[in-house]
């Protein structure tokens, strides 16, 4: 064996020789070459003997010992080659006894000779010391642990085999032996067989039983160049002989085998529906790592089936793209290797189905010709699409007048139709016809345009056309083919009726498109509608026709139609800008998405555009068209953007909607419109009854919209009569419900109409807007076919919109849902550019790309403008009346303006509004008519409010209609409010992106465009106080500046506030206004007020957080839209607000919080984004604290409200310190929730002079950095900062919100908490806490200890007083720096979290720390610490280090002593820490309680900046100089840097050593360096060491901008990225570890008693959390419901882009505020929205947010995701005892003729089983070389996965299962677990999602 081993080493030796010779050649020192030869040869005759004392090694010296002297011998031994111990013996020794060996264990021994020139090659031996007992395993005796049974007589057990020899080759070992002695047949020791074992170590052996006659055996498929131990035993019935061990080294593969290898790992990746990429591994190249030039590969493929013909491709590369395949077909692929003349064997076949795709070609030979004798009819024919394009679902024939491409209409025909008649054309016109096909996967391309000229005729009467439209409905069936009728049943009537209707519609539109006559989509409805509409206006018929047309597509391509419909409204919005077609076009841009889908929408819009009246009618027509297409489209676009034209038209149609008290006039209009819509709806419902019978509720919003659609007057009427609107909505609802049932299109249409009329109208408009915008979008998509411009946008929008609309429709609490959904979608769907183009107000959308909400919110603001307050009030009253009518409200929610902005600002909205929107939802809380704006805004109330708001808004709208934008904004606002997202959005809009809104928005806020775009001129004027450009800003600011002025005026001052605060300022101001008085209460936050009860502390705080979040959100909307919102929110808020401008500002914020409905939004709104949520949690606490402070320093407070909340109340206590403290606190920004305090920290305040906002932001950021800290320490920075703090908070929050929300601390480097932040605790302003008491709500309160049971019976002590987790030995859990991990009570009062907010102990008492969060804590840091979202690793346990505390500092006895290193006075860590921690979360009512760790000068005077300060965009932070002053660029804009930078540079202070017994990371535990109040905290920075973003670090921007495929990762303000080790598999479980477990049961008990209403607000701050490198899942996170709402659960809706445009949503329920969405496809856009529910029903739906998944990892999956392995749901038999997963079960067939079964924990964690047969039992898999990591091969992953739980094979029960040793090895069946070398696990994470299909 030695020679063989030596032989195997020759190759390496040659290599070294070559290297040495090369060196010799290069270095002209010949002697070196000679010297290199002097290393010794290997020792000879090496023997390894087993003795009682151990293992004895003997050897002889090597040859040539004289010429190559040996200086010493090296002996290495161990159980495996990976764990060897080394011993050196001198050259004169030739034997050695190894004593420290375990009996019965196989040891490898390596012997080498060494001298100064080198080492010989090793000689390997293996043997096991005597001892151990024999046990039977797998039917064969195997040596196991335990003493050897010496009593067994040798007479019975056979002797061991003789002369065992092992020969090795590159991948196999040949073993030969002689029979043992005395083994004859008659011998008592005869052998009945042999047991051969082999493996890479003694404990991981594979055993092969052999017959007694065998004398050789070959072990195949081994790894080359590896050392194996081989054991051989003879056995008989009595037992086995002693084993004989040999060690052998497999050789390098050198010579090419005669037989060519078979390719491995063939993978087929779907590239498109017609192409796949086949790749494979060439085993030779893999092993030799060199390319063989003559090697060729042949790929063969065919359709599945034995008779199919093979196609071949030959290539020299190891991958090939195979194209021209047939979609939706299973193909078989195989590969072989060829070299020279030789061909290898074909590999096993791999099967892959090509995905079905949308048609890739258009129908050919489209021919259109006039029908003789019928000047209005043409016949069309086309060729059917080939089968290769998939089964055609329907054909969509689009046509438009050649000179009016925006008036496009579409008719749909069943897939088997190839001809059609189109009626209703204009004689003498030239028409463009195009056709496209659709299948289940989507729309195909358009054919080339075919132009046909209609013969002239005297008959072209619009009325006749209208009648025709009505008639054609009947004739539809008579249209060219029955299909046409079928389609006509749907939106598209048969060709003739539809065409005719379309034409009539066009005419109607041209003549009087009222866009409201949302006639039923169906032809019949149309017929009726035509008449009814005629009564109302022919427009309705037109719309009806459109609707019917669209409808027809709806049934077959309902979604498309809807999309189209959606589009037009957007378009309408734009159109509205000008009466002429241009306006339409402008609108069209909004509609672009939709345009492709629904040309009809376009034509409607276009035709009305021709003249101002037509424009007016057009707007209605648009509505109609949208309505026809989709109720929502028409409403939103036309109204909002049509304000100018539309307003005129509306006024005409509706009376004068805008100028008049929209209420009165619109109402009257409404009644008729209502009637008409009702009838229309009815018609529709009759037409479309079957389509969506279930959508009545959903449709209600539509119905409302439809009613509005029914006539131009309808919108006004809806607006004007609060009751009417509401009533209308309600009545419409019934009708709508039928229409909704019809297909939701009608519903959509109706909303569209509403939108039109109420585009100024409040909610109805808003909702309609949303709907219509949605519809429009979809319409736009269809229309886009006709129109070249904006098609993509439109289509997108349309899809989105449609999805939204449908969702809305589908929602039972449809009113709200529709609106909400529509709104967001509209915003989304709309093409922003179009919106902006559409009209000046369009800017609104730009300002709030989330235009739906923003525009809404803004309008609301304007409508609430000072001039409109009464309106609002009146409205408010009405709203309250209407309140009960959620549907109405919903419709109202979607104002067209809102909608329009939505399209453009949707994304932004989605970001900011989402938060904002969710805030909005809460916003509705305010019911005070007082604040006019607020009233409208209240959408929080939204149903009723919305209705009222709608009325108000309508009047406001009418009012604003004068400034058409204003009216729109008003309605938008209103809508937004009801649709809460919009309001929030709008608010945030003003402040800009929602993320921005919190902190940054303010800066942007100043950009009036936002406001402008948001409000339109009208809104601006409404917001007289705020500048037109700042309408929205003012909104955001309103909360803040409130001190300057109440109402609008406050908005103007608000701008800076808003900016400083981001959206928050507005919220603050509103809060101020809302809750001036309330602010006084210590519960600074509105929440505080509500939640104020200290008893609630944590809960209150949390509630506060949630409320404040909502309120804040709302307030931001309110702030601009002003105080209105806020005031609305706080019924008295508006009055209070004015009174409270100065002082209460921060308070206002609190009040806003306190006033659950009203103030909430303001304070939170800024946070509206997820960040807001995080912030909101923080904010809540902070707001509580900040607000309290705020009372003192209104401005500051307001901006810092949360943070300073304690300051205000506390402020009173602390006098100078209070403010400073509070400001400091703001800096600390205790994060109630997750301990996001650190993250919450605001940047240091800018210099006192700097704007509060700026300062606020910086202050928040600075805490992180020492420099920042220093400003914090400075009085001026803090005070300002305080003022600003909330804004800063917001500003940071925007990004932070989600993360913060996730972990609160996660945002910023959690580790480096605001290092600069003074270590002051609550009581300290750099001095000891005089009060010594902890805030009631503070965590300090949970004094005491809790014992929890850890894994494996371990016990842990949670010491809440000291903030530690200890084990029985007194060792404490430590952080990544070896310091004690600080813990506190979570916001839910049950979860124990670290100061970063990362859960450490679950509410059920389960530990969440340790290795992978499932093991026992470690004594020292792990290699890869688990990081909370804040970035802090959880390390393990360390004995508490006793550090010298500063002599002066003594810790409070209760707390572990954590003297502040610099601080002279130790802070009682307990109270302080706890409090801080808690304070943030809990309401820190007492000023003393909240301590801003950020240093705040005791003397802090809170300057209240009077001018808004620009802030940085979301994702970036302001730069501050050493003094904490904001660094401004030459152009007056603050210098910004990426948010992440903050972690890196600013955290230097973290390096400061901590003198305390434990490092306190929490803000609370700010390093207790006492710094003079005025001193900057720099010296104090002994804060936590700066943390480098580690695994789990959270950021709104991905660490890597590009994914593995080189695509840019999707970035948005509401998107947060977690990073992970690129080599680790994706783990949903790990990602979820970053989320705090929020418990609803804490809120429910009290609230259930209070209310019997369904949730009144939509969830806010929706954030999408993605993990870099993981495309298959995201975690949707959102803010809790407003405190007033009782929420027992949530529904999360998700849809891919294709589903979104079809309004096809998947729904999942969640009991907490986050939910993972799994099995997402790569490179795909998804949409998400959330809805709260309780036992009384469902609340409104949040606006949707979108996210684009990243590319798949091309190196991960063996087969492509598009053609991922087909996992079949199948419940197989298995033993569930040994799995950690108990979810759904899937199976798939594998290439190795086994069935793989998986039981899911989640899509990325599962237990893998194998079986030979589907019906047999499935077994676990064992691994003798590892922990099953390579079993990921069974689920087609190339990755070595992670497995768990970690254990030892001895702890695993012995079970039956499959086992193998290495990847690619065939599995064998036997026992695994204890007593075997085969380890099995309870779960696997392989990075591959199962089932992998979304």
Swiss-Prot record:
Fibronectin type-III domain mapped to chain residues: 39-131, 158-258, 262-357, 362-457, 1658-1752
Modified residues (Phosphoserine): 717
A Pfam family annotated for this UniProt entry: TARSH_C
Entry keywords, A to Z: Glycoprotein, Phosphoprotein, Repeat, Secreted, Signal
PANTHER family: FIBRONECTIN TYPE III DOMAIN-CONTAINING PROTEIN 1 (PTHR23197:SF8), TARSH-RELATED FIBRONECTIN DOMAIN-CONTAINING (PTHR23197)
Purpose of the protein: May be an activator of G protein signaling.
Name of the protein described by the UniProt record: Fibronectin type III domain-containing protein 1
Organism of derivation: Homo sapiens
